Amino acid sequence: MSARTLFDKVWDAHTVKILPSGQTQLFIGLHLVHEVTSPQAFSMLRERGLKVLFPRRTIATVDHIVPTENQARPFLDDLAEEMIRAIETNVQTNHIPFYGIGSGNQGIVHVIAPEQGLTQPGMTIACGDSHTSTHGAFGAIAFGIGTSQVRDVLATQTLSLSKLKVRRVEVNGDLNPGVYAKDVILHIIRQLGVKGGVGYAYEYAGSTIERMSMEERMTICNMAIEGGARCGYINPDQITYDYLKGRDFAPKDWESAVNWWESIKSDADAVYDDVVVFDAGEIEPTVTWGITPGQGIGVNEVIPTPESLPASERAIAEEAYQYMKLTPGAPIKGTKIDVCFVGSCTNGRISDLREAAKFAQGHRVAPHVKAFIVPGSERVKKQAEAEGLDQIFLASGFEWREAGCSMCLAMNPDKLQGDQISASSSNRNFKGRQGSASGRTLLMSPAMVVAAAIKGEVTDPRELLN
């Protein structure tokens, strides 16, 4: 058999059949559901008299709309309470494992599945959420899906999908101090564009990626979708296996599992549809200035002028200048910040909070800034508190919250007001993304968010290191 990529091997292993349309009917090994995209799917099942085919292959939690301050039931928001009750009823009726608030396992769906060992190499994973690509960090093929597809997976445990091309995205060399996985992925999206990955799965590789921890790899794969790729993945290795070993759902026959995981790695002579290579040493602490994740620059660069951009990017740039109220040619560094948020499925894990605490320790949040830290899961919160990270944040003037999606999106009480501008460790800076029709979002690493909170403006985090 000819050399194949991991994507080819996993796709082939999960192919049920090729449909008359040319699409593949693909078996889904793990289905993750939350309170926002599942109620309609369960309703459609009931309307058709269908049942959940494999309840144990679905895992449910609540994350998008849960408040991160007052979690007393019933919630103050009637719609939020209604949606939480709906998923509680649906999982009970269909015998689906559920991690609710206070269970010790609740959290952002893309945080809790990896930390419990549910996400494993060689899996196909689906979830009604764009950032399901996160799970590709383990060598899984993971897709975000729509509500009708959530229904399909619940009813059949399969999806009808067109096979993607594969682009190998290599990053080689050593990262400079103060440069993180978030900077790497923002740099990649800046260079390849928000539509550059359409029709592709991205295989992230190279010496830089190979040295990353699993949580850093999850940050990389989380934002594959922001570059247009339906999924992104990294070949599993010893770092992957060390992370998974001993977790709740790790395979009992460990040796056999590792042997299989080794066999699905991309062959050394696999042929890719495209290959791009980046030099890690050229990546700077990166911040977005516009209204797409591709509108990013190094923290010491100036906001691009229309003349400096390709003709194809000028229209969206003009839209961004107007919305963001930023001046072309002006430095991004020094931009005043109103709200600072560390959290999300991109950067709400324990390693993110440890790094944030390192920058916060011994400093105080600027008087005009509202700053808060939101752990990605109840487990992350418990671990952070065991390490005393919460006390560092509180002493520095940050708010310490309960687990949830929080200010990543405008579905819970954590929202921008008016034309406030936020420094955010999340993954999207679209217009109105954080709750205000005129609110503005600058994406950056947790370290840079903390630096911005302390200085009250966009700051090179390396200044705090020094």
UniProtKB/Swiss-Prot annotation:
GO molecular function: 3-isopropylmalate dehydratase activity; 4 iron, 4 sulfur cluster binding; metal ion binding
Cofactor: [4Fe-4S] cluster
UniProt key word 4Fe-4S: yes
Catalyzed reaction equations: (2R,3S)-3-isopropylmalate = (2S)-2-isopropylmalate
Keyword DNA-binding among record annotations: no
Any one biological process term the GO annotation gives: L-leucine biosynthetic process
A Pfam entry, by short name: Aconitase
Binding-site list for [4Fe-4S] cluster: C345, C405, C408
Matching InterPro entries: 3-IsopropMal_deHydase_lsu, Acnase/IPM_dHydase_lsu_aba_1/3, Acoase/IPM_deHydtase_lsu_aba, Aconitase_4Fe-4S_BS, Aconitase_4Fe-4S_dom, IPM_dehydratase_rel_enz, IPMI_cat
Top-level EC class: lyase
Biochemical pathway: Amino-acid biosynthesis; L-leucine biosynthesis; L-leucine from 3-methyl-2-oxobutanoate: step 2/4
Recorded superkingdom: Bacteria
Entry note: cofactor: Binds 1 [4Fe-4S] cluster per subunit.
Known EC number: 4.2.1.33
Keywords: 4Fe-4S, Amino-acid biosynthesis, Branched-chain amino acid biosynthesis, Iron, Iron-sulfur, Leucine biosynthesis, Lyase, Metal-binding
The protein's role, per its UniProt record: Catalyzes the isomerization between 2-isopropylmalate and 3-isopropylmalate, via the formation of 2-isopropylmaleate.
Subunit structure, as described in the record: Heterodimer of LeuC and LeuD.
Family: Belongs to the aconitase/IPM isomerase family. LeuC type 1 subfamily.
Name the UniProt record assigns to this protein: 3-isopropylmalate dehydratase large subunit
Organism annotation: Microcystis aeruginosa (strain NIES-843 / IAM M-2473)
Gene responsible for this protein: leuC
